[in-house]
A protein has these predicted regions:
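Active-site HxH/HxHxD metal-binding segment of metal-dependent hydrolases
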Residues: 100-135
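Metal-dependent catalytic neighborhoods of phosphoester/phosphodiester hydrolases
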Residues: 79-93, 115-122, 232-233
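A short acidic-Thr-Gly-centered motif at the start of a beta-strand
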Residues: 26-35, 65-66, 93-97, 175-178, ...
């Protein structure tokens, strides 16, 4: 008989009320990680370099207190936009990758940055998704209602301002990562379509069709993209986007064997 995987409250909870709610939660399935491996999965950062630094400190403390043979950091995308320090966030991730095993996924906001670099007219749409603070983080002066000439100039300046390390990091982002009984992705997956045949558009953008689906998927889906007030753990998915840019909460999911915890 499969026993339910335990959903443990975070060691540093957001509040007593949430902690009491989380203590009663349990998922019916029993998704497993490989023996001897611990994964730290992180939700949407959105330019909050300050919160990312704090999160790294929490993870380091956790590793010191509970050492394990192998660890993997997984970031679910949307490192940029909305918050004020997108460039600094990429610096932190690149630096962390020098000393830790990491897998960084692509989010829809990174998609917009790529689109802007290929087609400057996308700026008017990108700015609706919080793209102007990203330009500012690279020392550029954003223009709210830029005409085509100004859009092209901003695009050229961003190409020049973008460090090679950032370009390489962004070019290397993956659409998904799978490990054990878990499938990590930015937005979610389309129900009824095998995980091996998912479209990039859905992996980066899907919402209602995925969020309202209650039946099990091939694996437990760990995702971000849709902000929630607290981590949302369900029988078929775990949402760890807690709206960091607005709430000041950057969530880190800790997976080890059948344990589902937060740090």
């Amino acid at each position: 008989m499969l026993r339910g995987a335990i959903f443990r409250p975070p060691r540093k909870a957001y509040g007593k009320v949430q902690l009491l709610m989380w203590k009663t939660r349990r998922i019916n399935a029993s998704p497993l990680m490989p023996e001897g491996l611990r994964i730290y999965a992180v939700g949407d950062v959105h330019g909050r370099a300050d919160l990312l630094k704090q999160l790294f400190s929490r993870v380091d403390e956790d590793l010191k207190e509970y050492p394990i043979g192998e660890t993997l950091h997984i970031f679910l995308g949307d490192y940029i936009d909305r918050g004020q320090d997108s460039a600094a966030v990429l610096d932190l991730l690149i630096e962390r990758a020098r000393t830790h095993r990491m897998s960084c996924l692509k989010g829809n906001h990174e998609f917009f940055l790529f689109e802007f670099l290929e087609n400057p007219s996308v700026l008017k749409h990108w700015q609706q998704y919080g793209g102007l603070p990203t330009l500012a983080s690279y020392g550029l002066t954003p223009i709210t209602n830029a005409d085509p000439k100004e859009q092209a100039e901003l695009c050229a300046r961003l190409w020049y301002a973008l460090p090679k390390s950032h370009s390489q990091f962004l070019a290397g982002l993956k659409l998904f990562f799978t490990c054990g009984d878990f499938f990590f992705v930015h937005a979610g997956v389309r129900p009824g379509t095998p995980l091996s045949r998912q479209r990039e558009e859905d992996l980066l953008w899907i919402r209602d069709e995925f969020l309202l689906h209650e039946k099990p998927f091939e694996k437990m889906i760990v995702h971000g993209h849709t902000p929630v007030m607290e981590p949302d753990v369900r029988n078929n998915r775990i949402n760890i986007d807690t709206g960091a840019y607005a709430t000041g909460r950057l969530t880190c999911l800790r997976l080890e064997r059948d344990k589902i915890e937060f740090v």
